[in-house]
A protein has these predicted regions:
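Short His-centered aromatic/hydrophobic patch
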Residues: 61-67
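Nucleotide-activated donor-binding/catalytic signature segment of Leloir-type glycosyltransferases, i.e.
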Residues: 75, 202-267
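Carbohydrate-associated surface elements
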Residues: 113, 132
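Aromatic "clamp/platform" in nucleotide-sugar-dependent glycosyltransferases that forms part
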Residues: 280
Length: 344
């Protein structure tokens, strides 16, 4: 995958020991068997060896719930303090997560939505532990600095609606586009800023064409892999020429391999006038908190972890949604109302 290799210098930066999943030859064998590949990816093949070698006082498991399959049966499980911190973002709660609750004393989830659901099932020891972010990195610039920042990106009196997200299917891109289209009819100066990668997940150009939205009204973030500068402008394809350093084919939409720094991301929030985050479900959705620290009004789907961030005291407005069921899992998912996005 895109993980850090064992011999990478990055493994030397933290105060921890790193272990590789397996030998290259063994990895090739695991790839052929989907379940074994997944288990190895979660560290299941080395956990016993690591416990024996390090003799830890505390085991902290921060993974999807299926990563801990039968860990409670291991001889070391009840001999040390064990804690899991897992993402539960939809109702009904995943059966594996419910079954594991009585098997671990310290059970943490990422949102009070999940804590509430688990307690309704009788598991009062489940608690919420939220993901952390550096609050010193996200703040609102004074109006003069915001004006200069916007002008540096060719923006003057436009009204910018922003959405920071990984381009995944659970992020409701069609919904925000439809809501923006309705809003644009009432506010001619509106622009939509999608800080995401345009070469994965939703085919955004196709959606814009289907919805008859002018591509020039939808902005995105480009990052140069050479000079690390960023540009805010309409999408015009990948591997563009950087306007700052002049490098050819080094400018791409922000992505997991090359993104912006926290300082740059804070600047991008400061380009916005309002932040909108529609999604089907989520564990925490940290960009919502970053936007709040930047003193933006946030519009958030009122489901899953969104329930925590669209309350009156949180500085956010709830977005209405309709239920649909995810095939296979039968999870309840949210389809955010485009009209409510427009009205809010």
């Amino acid at each position: 995958g895109k993980g850090i290799e064992l011999d990478s210098k990055a493994t030397k930066h933290g105060r921890w020991e790193c272990r590789e999943a397996s030998t290259p030859a063994h990895i090739k064998q695991l790839i052929k068997k989907k379940k074994k590949k997944r288990d190895a990816g979660y560290g299941a093949k080395l956990i016993d060896k690591a416990i024996q070698e390090f003799k830890p006082d505390v085991y902290i498991g921060m993974e999807d719930i299926w990563a801990f399959n039968n860990y409670n049966l291991k001889p070391w499980w009840h001999k040390i303090n064990t804690m899991i911190w897992t993402t539960l973002d939809s109702l009904p709660i995943l059966p594996q997560a419910v079954d594991f609750a009585p098997k671990v004393k310290h059970y943490y989830v990422w949102s009070s939505f999940a804590e509430k659901a688990m307690k309704e099932l009788g598991y009062d020891h489940v608690k919420t532990l939220r993901g952390s972010l550096d609050e010193n990195m996200f703040f609102r610039h004074n109006e003069e600095d915001r004006k200069k920042l916007r002008e540096s990106h060719g923006l003057t009196d436009e009204f910018i609606v922003g959405f920071v997200f990984r381009n995944q299917l659970r992020k409701s891109v069609p919904n925000i586009l439809e809501g923006f289209k309705l809003f644009k009819q009432k506010n001619s100066k509106a622009k939509l800023l999608l800080h995401t990668h345009w070469s994965e997940g939703w085919d955004i150009p196709r959606l814009l064409n289907e919805k008859n939205i002018d591509p020039s009204d939808v902005l995105t973030t480009y990052v140069c892999s050479n000079c690390l500068s960023y540009e805010i402008r309409p999408f015009s394809g990948q591997e563009q020429k950087c306007n700052k350093c002049g490098s050819e084919k080094t400018l791409n939409t922000t992505n997991t391999s090359r993104g912006v720094t926290d300082q740059q991301l804070n600047e991008i929030y400061n380009l916005m006038d309002v932040y909108c985050h529609p999604f089907t479900s989520g564990g925490q959705e940290i960009p919502i908190q970053e936007a709040k620290l930047s003193e933006l009004i946030t519009l958030v789907t009122n489901y899953s972890c969104g329930e925590d961030t669209c309350t009156e005291e949180s500085g956010g407005f709830p977005l209405e949604w309709s239920e649909y069921r995810e095939p296979g899992t039968q999870f309840i998912k949210a389809s955010t109302h485009a009209l409510d996005i427009c009205d809010k």
